């Protein structure tokens, strides 16, 4: 058995379903070994697409997504998606080929120090310098990637090592996969948290992506409902509590004084559950550092002058909340009701005006929500549309609106939708993207066609980098190099064999969405959007009292 065969056997042992990547010269042995494997290799049109697919697979499944590249340019192309997974706390294992050991001491074709490059965007990385260490290296890569806080790991496999025969029998078997245990909180931590929360007059819960990773959303709902404490979610925490719930404060994350931010201004105790600074810094919701913070998570709190923890309760999030909640009485329901009413009123006012042309972001969101069921999946690319979707797209369940908010790399939308559809073929999948993000990885439309994946790509077109235009206008009152032209997006889609649609008036979007969702193949919708609403939103939020 060759080392490449052992590598594939170890990946199978970890339960790998899909391997996203590109074949190359230095990974020939690995590609050949995959022919005899149950792992499905998904050939992408760019390594960045492969890394984004592994990234979103990890977010949705909780299991490490795996991506593969050759050396040199293949490895550098993976880098952005790997970094995105690492900051979005998505478990991912990247495997890159490398030059043979006998040419690493000198200048060599396509050889670069890949280990050093990946070190800064992963939790752990290593070179497989001998076939015998493959079982240990693979097991550690998956264990580290999937352990809180999850993220990316990287393995480098030199070409000559991949082709070597594995020697002794004891080195030719994968290591046993051990499931993580659920750590229980310490009694003293729980008791102190109960004291702090019991003394609160205006408590609020800030729930982050750690809740979803820990499959603890039901525990958050129980805790909030039993105690009448309102819940705000981070962008990556959407769906922890249904937005239709009377305790939902929607999402906190816009770097402006949005409606939920006013609740945090009045709150005296913030119960931060699975909250991650990488999404939304504490200085935005605790500018004076004077809130009493109860930190509930598997991991200790990060150090921050605006996040002075009164008590940290460390352990499995669901166990922590259930134990804290068991010793508390309900808060005043009037506080929670007033918080919710103020936010709902604000959003209703935004939706009150009749649809205009081009469509306003709020109305695109309303039509999209109406077209989808609660369990369908939306993958949101990065741009101005992300801010609108995070604020206003209602979710009933976790992992139904995936937003990249750590590294926040543009271009994740189309590859992410492919991963979501492969993982959940029975659910409808829509990517919401801007014309900037779409063209960064639009080549993966061919991958979707080849795999026969019926998914919808809703392109909010404004012929520019909308969120940067918004910020330039706010800061300088003018713009700089943010405008561009686009191809005919309908013809572009059709050139791949996909369906192409164009919205030409506000009343068409609902029927176009229905047609695209039911066409049975990948579809692209060109939807012009009026982003003058961005500045109007800023002015509206400034006027809040």
Predicted regions and their residues:
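Phosphate/pyrophosphate-binding active-site segments
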Residues: 132, 168-169, 289-386, 506-515, ...
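Active-site diphosphate/adenylate-binding microenvironment
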Residues: 7, 12, 27-31, 35, ...
